[in-house]
Amino acid sequence: MYKTILVNKQNKIKESYLKKIKLINTKDINNKDVLIEKETYENYLKLKDFLKEKNIEIGISSAYRSIEDQEKIYNEFLEKYGEKYTKTHVAVPYTSEHHTGLCLDINVKVNGCFPKDNYALEKQKEYYESIYKYLKDFGFILRYPKGKENITGVLYEPWHIRYVGVVPASIIMNNNWTLEEYLKEFSGVIVINKKSGPTSFDIVNDVSHIFGIKKVGHTGTLDPLAEGILIIAIGKATKIVELLTSKDKEYIAEVKLGFCTDSYDTDGFILNKCSIPDNLDISNVLNSFKKTYMQEVPIYSAVKVNGKKLYEYARSGKNVTLPKKEVTIKEIELISKNSSSFTFRTLVTKGCYIRSLIQDISKELGVYATMSRLIRTKQGVVSIDKSNTINDLLNNNYKILSIEECLDYPIVIIDNDDRFKVTNGVRLENKWNIKDRVIFKDSNNRLLGIYEVRDNMLVTWKNFN
């Protein structure tokens, strides 16, 4: 369940979400029962204890509300405060954040007492403002900040906090954003140093939930056995996935000699064994693969043949003709070797399977070989030293790259006239003598788009508005 779910006048809460909420019962400031989403409550207690050490005492006046609860509150406000006040201060059913269980109306105890009504509550704004700087450390944001009414559609509510998780909360509060702005504007590239075990999809799913962003994708699958960089695009950065996927990739591979498996790696079943000859000329054989050739795709891969993935054929025991792809081995060198294994580094083009490369090398060596370890160390201009672990993300200690940092295109800052043209996808004269593609940014360093040369004119390739 995404903690960044957006509920407002334009985005009504769905019944499917309401069925999934895990609620727990606690007491509000009037000692009445109140329900709160479990993780939200756990972090609220941490915030409450932290503030208590600073002599600030807070309590909950409202949390989760059912659709029926919201209808009742709306009608009560209508009767007590009138239509004008109610429409600007109370959400109609299905559009209230309180349906999520993730938001809290908190009260501050002043002179030993909590406020008795809404009028008294509004007089305490200065007390609320003193705690805002602490919210993000516990995963909360001020949901309806001052000066953002045109974005949220709700008047400033100093008492209304919302749990989104520590990582999104830090980004939102540091950028002075609302939740709406975060979900629209936040984008970038996260480089994950994947450990052996999880699938690429597992990592994408983790990143998606940590940031609370659904629009997430990776730029080149790593097998479960493989390690190293998995480049993950978030938000608008997903527009450049195809660019990053097409970049050359560098790997370090470890190879075991004397046996082969059905999957070409040590995760598979052993098919054949052999003795290992002495004095294998591994270095020269590797060097002979510095070329372009047609490589056979391994049976254990996600490549489709007749609408079916190859690994599905393998698992069902059905025969299939394996397709071949043109690949280029740009660089390859021996790093180390012993009597039963060797390690090499290689730089290859898109679509090259290192497992298949090792099988081709083994045929030239005249000995069975199997990949025992694979580390992707570089993809395009992005290297492993720019990577993060999933724990780095969870600990809110990570580096996110901008779109332009991941591309090796020239960057041009344009004036307002050209800015208007770029944002509207207008063709431009190639007055900058661009040879391939160019990244356009405005004077505020905002990324506008990527243009490419076509018939000596510059035309839109990707627009980021």
Q: Predicted segments — roles?
A:
Residues 1-185:
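Extracytoplasmic cell-surface/polysaccharide-interacting catalytic and binding patches
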Residues 137-139, 288-293, 363-370:
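A common structural junction motif
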Residues 186-195, 201-222, 226-229, 247, ...:
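Accessory RNA 3′-end/elbow-binding domains used by RNA modification enzymes
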Residues 206-213, 231, 320-351, 355-366:
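The conserved catalytic core of RNA pseudouridine synthases
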Residues 232, 253, 307, 357, ...:
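Residue-level signal for inorganic ion chemistry
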Residues 242-257, 320-334:
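Structural signature of FAD isoalloxazine-binding scaffolds in flavoprotein oxidoreductases
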Residues 243-294:
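Acidic, low-complexity central loop/insert segments
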Residues 300-330:
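Extended alpha-helical targeting/anchoring segments
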